[in-house]
């Protein structure tokens, strides 16, 4: 086969996205070191890489590709947290029996797939997580960013380097309007069931010099067992963090806490290939901010307000890439350089089936400023 070519995404009209690339012809079942090197370089350079026509990709090959970015990684990025019934992640994922690092996600009834029989998948609807959902009568045409996040346990396990997401079955073609509903008046036209991406590198670039310095010198402390801790809380309408209504579970109601597993991570992470800084904060899981002068901000409302102020500019419509899924698309995204969100709500009979793989990294994130 000829050498694979990487083509940067052409931004749609009115978009200012400066990330994303497409690779059309690559045999992932027989991936040469040279072709993998091209894909790896593309991931770090473009942050989101779409590999077209991967209908035949096996779960094993998907796992092996994901692991090739980090050979020391072997276990699913959230470990066994899915076993916790109270975790907000619990309902959304099912595991492939013969390749347990690969999850099945989607919407609707699937009679048989890769050893899973008679499963009903549920695409998360924003009304299950947002405090003030869109009225029912507007629900068919309008939607929200469900939850902007990084794929990471944020407790014990290191954030995965890459997530791979394969579209096996995609319902056809209608579009929806994402409403921000935050007073900005912003909306975004998106394909049904898109996955939305925002660049952490652009997020950092958009900061004032003062905010850049604050971000570079500060670290975020995440809650222990964050997806259980946050489970009663409800999201802002932008999907970028939570309302501070004192609904989080008290630490005494969480599973046993290992203090050494609590993560305090830099706000700004360094791209290992390009050296660029990316503002990478999981806004729903933040609990404290450790400032450069040694002080700790532990007022949760204030912590969330600071994170929101830093992150909100980069999720305005012109900076968001909303991928228009086609069956056979395998999207790789640099989980340490972008935030992403589920989007959309499916109607009766709209069936979607995706496979996802991410692996807890062998090494921790690299701070931009040591």
From Swiss-Prot:
One of its GO terms (cellular component) is cytosol. InterPro entries: TauD-like_sf, TauD/TfdA-like, TfdA_dioxygenase. Changing residue 167 to D: In xanA1; impairs catalytic activity. Changing residue 358 to A: Exhibits a 23-fold decrease in kcat/Km and affects the inhibition by 6,8-dihydroxypurine. It holds the Pfam family TauD. Its EC number is 1.14.11.48. This is Alpha-ketoglutarate-dependent xanthine dioxygenase xanA. Keywords: Cytoplasm, Dioxygenase, Glycoprotein, Iron, Metal-binding, Oxidoreductase, Phosphoprotein. Binds 1 Fe(2+) ion per subunit. It is an enzyme of class 1 (oxidoreductase). GO terms for molecular function: alpha-ketoglutarate-dependent xanthine dioxygenase activity; dioxygenase activity; metal ion binding. 2-oxoglutarate binds at residues 195, 325, 352. Substrate binds at residue 107. It catalyses: xanthine + 2-oxoglutarate + O2 = urate + succinate + CO2. Alpha-ketoglutarate-dependent xanthine dioxygenase is a non-heme mononuclear Fe(2+) enzyme that decarboxylates alpha-ketoglutarate to succinate and CO(2) while hydroxylating xanthine to generate uric acid. Allows xanthine utilization as a nitrogen source. Whereas xanA is highly specific for xanthine, alpha-ketoadipic acid can replace alpha-ketoglutarate as a cosubstrate. Exhibits ferroxidase activity in the absence of substrates. Belongs to the TfdA dioxygenase family. Changing residue 101 to A: Leads to elevated ferroxidase activity in the absence of substrates. Glycosylated. Is subject to both N- and O-linked glycosylation. Phosphorylated. The keyword Repressor does not apply. Optimum pH is 6.5 to 7.4. Changing residue 340 to A: Exhibits only 0.17% of the wild-type enzyme activity. Its main location: cytoplasm.
């Amino acid at each position: 086969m000829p050498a694979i070519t990487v083509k940067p995404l052409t931004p749609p009209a009115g978009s200012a996205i400066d990330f994303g690339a497409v690779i059309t012809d690559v045999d992932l079942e027989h991936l040469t070191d040279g072709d993998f090197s091209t894909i790896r370089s593309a991931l770090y350079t473009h942050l989101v890489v779409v590999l077209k026509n991967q209908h035949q990709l096996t779960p094993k090959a998907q796992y092996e590709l994901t692991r090739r970015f980090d050979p020391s990684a072997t276990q699913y990025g959230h470990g066994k947290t899915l076993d916790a019934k109270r975790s907000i992640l619990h309902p959304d994922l099912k595991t492939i029996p013969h390749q347990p690092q690969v999850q099945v996600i989607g919407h609707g009834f699937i009679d048989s797939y890769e050893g899973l029989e008679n499963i009903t998948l549920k695409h998360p609807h924003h009304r299950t997580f947002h405090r003030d959902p869109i009225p029912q009568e507007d629900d068919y045409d309008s939607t929200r960013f469900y939850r902007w996040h990084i794929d990471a346990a944020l407790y014990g396990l290191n954030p995965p380097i890459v997530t791979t997401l394969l579209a096996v079955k995609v319902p056809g073609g209608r579009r929806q309007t994402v409403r921000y509903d935050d007073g900005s008046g912003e909306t975004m036209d998106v394909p049904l069931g898109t996955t939305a991406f925002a660049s952490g590198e652009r997020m950092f670039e958009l900061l004032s010099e003062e905010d850049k310095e604050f971000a570079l010198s500060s670290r975020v402390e995440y809650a222990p067992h964050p997806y259980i801790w946050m489970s009663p809380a409800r999201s802002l309408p932008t999907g970028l963090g939570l309302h501070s209504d004192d609904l989080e579970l008290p630490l005494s109601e969480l599973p046993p806490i290992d203090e050494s597993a609590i993560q305090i991570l830099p706000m700004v992470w360094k791209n290992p290939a390009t050296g660029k800084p990316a503002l990478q904060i999981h806004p729903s899981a933040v609990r404290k901010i450790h400032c450069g002068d040694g002080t700790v901000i532990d007022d949760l409302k204030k912590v969330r307000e600071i994170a929101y102020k830093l992150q909100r500019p980069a999720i305005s419509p012109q900076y968001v890439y909303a991928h228009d899924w086609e069956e056979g698309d395998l999207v790789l995204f640099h989980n340490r350089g972008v935030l992403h969100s589920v989007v959309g709500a499916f109607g009766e009979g709209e069936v979607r089936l995706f496979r996802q793989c991410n692996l807890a990294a062998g090494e921790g994130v690299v701070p931009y400023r040591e």
